[in-house]
């Protein structure tokens, strides 16, 4: 077996129709994500990050609850930048410490989420990117 050296290698090994990320407890319309869909989304996310001046070596903090959306965000961002998942239960002072320590270029939060991470990022001049889950 060859050595996997990056996210692209990991995504490439899955058959197009194979399940890459499951969505237990979701409605049938919210089906699991296939490797083909995850690869396509990773390309879109990397392109979007690059258009916003974020690339390899740049740190992107992610504040999302555990679940398929977090897994997808982590994998797709990691395809083009350094991911730094942060606990959504952190307090404002903890987010301040970690966002400073990470030197994050962007923060991803769920649309409409009132996390203190958002206010900290805005005060620090860190771009806040909102994840809009596809619930159809």
Description of each model-found segment:
Residues 75-76, 120:
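Hydrophobic/aromatic ligand-binding patch that stacks against planar heteroaromatic rings
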Residues 11-14, 25, 36, 111, ...:
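Residues at the C-termini of beta-strands that transition into short coil/loop
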Residues 20-67, 71-75, 91-96:
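Conserved AMP-binding/adenylate-forming core of the ANL superfamily
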Residues 18, 29, 80, 125-126:
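A generic structural signal for alpha->beta connector loops
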Residues 51-52, 81-136:
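Structural core segment of the AMP-binding/adenylate-forming
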């Amino acid at each position: 077996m060859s050595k996997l050296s990056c996210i692209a290698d990991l995504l490439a090994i899955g058959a197009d129709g194979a399940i890459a990320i499951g969505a237990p407890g979701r409605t049938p319309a919210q089906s699991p994500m296939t490797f083909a869909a995850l690869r396509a989304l990773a390309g879109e996310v990397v392109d979007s990050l690059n258009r916003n001046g974020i690339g390899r070596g740049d740190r992107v903090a992610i504040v999302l609850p555990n679940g398929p959306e977090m897994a997808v965000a982590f994998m797709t961002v990691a395809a083009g930048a350094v991911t730094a998942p942060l606990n959504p239960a952190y307090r404002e002072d903890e987010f301040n410490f970690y966002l400073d320590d990470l030197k994050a270029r962007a923060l991803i939060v769920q649309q409409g989420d009132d996390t203190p991470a958002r206010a900290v990022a805005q005060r620090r001049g860190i771009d806040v990117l909102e994840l809009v889950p596809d619930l159809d």
